[in-house]
């Protein structure tokens, strides 16, 4: 894989191993060998297969795997969910555990819905509770104090269910953008609440400690406050917690109550998941999409991610146990926007959403075929009995033979409780020099200021080629494009180029959502997606 100047700087700063003086003692090939050989666990055939997989750039695992495989930490997962119990001991146990996870490069999600509301009686002290929002500040301060593995600051997700008595305070707790800067916050939305919004009815707020209704409030007022705050500064988000649990693969183990910080990975309390993403843009070869290569990359990637579970050293025994009982992995994609540029398909088109669904169905289907094969060789995940799979349930309907797959899982088992997740891929897509996740490109051209006041132009290579092919490329033109990052108002550029080379702000929110829905149909977990609005929205 060709490593760009930007990618090399990121790798040197955050990924390559260093000596006691902070000097890099690795290059790209060294890192690939370190990671591949460690995950393969001494298997020579696998080591070579994993070297080829990573070095080609077809697949990259999440950052903690690249950073920590083969070193003393050996903490390889990106996503964690921790329980927060309704006691001082339980709360500060979670603070400590989150600090350990952040130190090793992971992100944490929490539900604060178990904590009793503000001013609720605390019998042991004959005092009153300060409520969940006050403890958010404690978690936030602890995150500030622990810089992740010396490489990146920790990230958190806080969820409070919509029927918690402190929900109004929670919805507005980030109105000041300087508050809780290490947290994304989301309201846990239920079907009952949405029905009350639809019917313009009141709904009950219930004390998690006593189970008593503390008051009833208008659902529309709460919903409108969520919308108002989200419009003001992007928070809170909403998490459809009932819907998440409708698709919980192991309901017999417990309910999922939170996600990771970016929202694409719902997990049980004390559970973690390791993710990895395939670069779709590299699969456009000689003016056609290489489906055979994609199939092989899927098989090798599932193998790799399953081995990551075996090689991980988790910071807590409880996490190690839950992870190995469910063996969840999250295989996703990056380079989607660049693939569409190569194929000359507009992102905001039916052709693109149909291709998205076809691609993701193929990936999801073959990831499960490989997981079935691994189950035949090494056994199903231990919580298979009682899971949706043991009951012949698989929420899929598409062009491929899902009935056959469903029957195979019932009879042969499956190695992993989930196989697919679409992550944001912010840093690994930069390393791979491709577009992130399933997002459109943010800008076609941008200017970077370097030393001595020099300015460097960075032009999307697919756009650059299209402009050269049309005989329109010039540095002056690229500087003009860099002013907005978009070409939609530039009449000198032919319409057929403008239609294909759209950027995130050229695409209406409706098309962003259609694209997300097309991928989500064939994803076990969720899709991390940004919906861009105009400044006037």
Segments predicted by a language model, with ranges:
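Acidic/polar, glycine-rich intrinsically disordered N-terminal extensions of enzymes
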Residues: 1-76, 82, 223-225, 232
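Core structural elements
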Residues: 3-11, 53-69, 162, 300-311, ...
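Terminal amphipathic helices with adjacent charged low-complexity linkers/tails
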Residues: 6-12, 172, 187-193, 198, ...
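Flexible, glycine/charged-enriched surface loops at secondary-structure junctions
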Residues: 45-50, 107-110, 150-157, 237-240, ...
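Active-site cavity-forming subdomains of large catalytic enzyme subunits
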Residues: 77-291, 314, 318-321, 367, ...
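A structural-propensity feature for long, helix-poor, extended segments
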Residues: 117-156, 285-313, 368-372, 451-498, ...
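Catalytic alpha/beta core of large soluble enzyme barrels
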Residues: 264-266, 305-310, 408-415, 420-537
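Internal maturation/activation junctions in enzymes
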Residues: 297-320, 345-425, 493-500, 514, ...
């Amino acid at each position: 894989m060709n490593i760009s100047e930007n990618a090399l700087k990121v790798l040197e700063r955050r990924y390559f191993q260093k000596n006691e003086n902070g000097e890099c003692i690795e290059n790209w090939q060294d890192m690939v060998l370190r990671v591949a050989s460690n995950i393969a666990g001494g298997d020579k055939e696998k080591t070579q297969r994993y070297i080829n997989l990573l070095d080609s750039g077809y697949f990259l695992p999440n950052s903690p795997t690249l950073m920590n495989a083969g070193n003393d930490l050996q903490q390889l997962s990106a996503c964690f969910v921790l329980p927060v119990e309704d006691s001082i001991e339980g709360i500060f146990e979670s603070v400590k555990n989150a600090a350990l996870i952040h130190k090793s490069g992971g992100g944490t999600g929490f539900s604060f819905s178990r904590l009793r509301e503000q001013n609720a009686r605390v019998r042991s002290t004959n005092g009153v509770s300060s409520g969940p929002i006050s403890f958010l500040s404690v978690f936030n301060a602890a995150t500030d104090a622990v810089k992740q593995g010396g490489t990146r600051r920790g990230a958190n997700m806080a969820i409070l269910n919509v029927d918690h008595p402190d929900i109004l305070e929670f919805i507005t707790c980030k109105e000041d953008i300087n508050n809780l800067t290490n947290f994304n916050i989301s309201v846990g939305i239920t079907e009952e609440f949405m029905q009350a919004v639809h019917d313009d009815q009141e709904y009950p707020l219930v004390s998690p400690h006593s189970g008593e209704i503390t008051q009833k409030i208008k659902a529309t007022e709460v919903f409108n406050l969520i919308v108002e705050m989200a419009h003001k500064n992007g928070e809170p988000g909403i998490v459809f917690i009932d819907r998440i649990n409708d698709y919980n693969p192991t309901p017999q183990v417990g309910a999922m109550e939170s996600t990771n910080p970016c929202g694409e990975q719902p997990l049980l309390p004390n559970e973690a998941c390791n993710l990895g993403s395939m670069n779709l843009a590299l699969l456009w070869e000689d003016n056609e999409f290489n489906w055979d290569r994609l199939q092989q990359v899927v098989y090798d990637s599932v193998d790799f991610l399953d081995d990551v579970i075996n090689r991980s050293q988790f910071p807590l025994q409880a996490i190690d146990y839950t992870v190995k009982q469910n063996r969840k992995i999250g295989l996703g994609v990056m380079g989607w926007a660049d693939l569409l540029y190569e194929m000359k398909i507009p992102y905001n088109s039916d052709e693109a959403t149909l291709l998205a669904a076809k691609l993701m169905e193929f990936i999801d289907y073959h990831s499960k075929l490989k997981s079935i094969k691994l189950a035949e060789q090494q056994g199903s995940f231990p919580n298979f009995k009682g899971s949706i799979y043991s009951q012949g349930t698989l929420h899929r309907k598409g062009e491929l033979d899902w009935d056959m797959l469903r029957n195979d899982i019932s009879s042969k088992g499956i190695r992993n409780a989930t196989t697919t997740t679409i992550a944001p891929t912010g840093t690994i897509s930069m390393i791979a020099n491709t577009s992130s996740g399933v997002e459109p490109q943010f800008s076609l051209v941008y200017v970077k200021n370097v030393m001595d006041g020099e300015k460097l132009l960075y032009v999307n290579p697919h756009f650059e080629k299209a402009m050269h092919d049309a005989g329109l490329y010039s540095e002056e033109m690229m500087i003009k494009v860099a002013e907005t990052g978009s070409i939609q108002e530039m009449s000198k550029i032919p319409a057929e180029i403008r239609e294909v080379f759209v950027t995130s702000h050229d695409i209406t929110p409706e098309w962003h959502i259609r694209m997300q829905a097309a991928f989500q149909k064939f994803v076990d977990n969720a899709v991390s997606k940004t919906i861009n609005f105009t400044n006037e929205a």
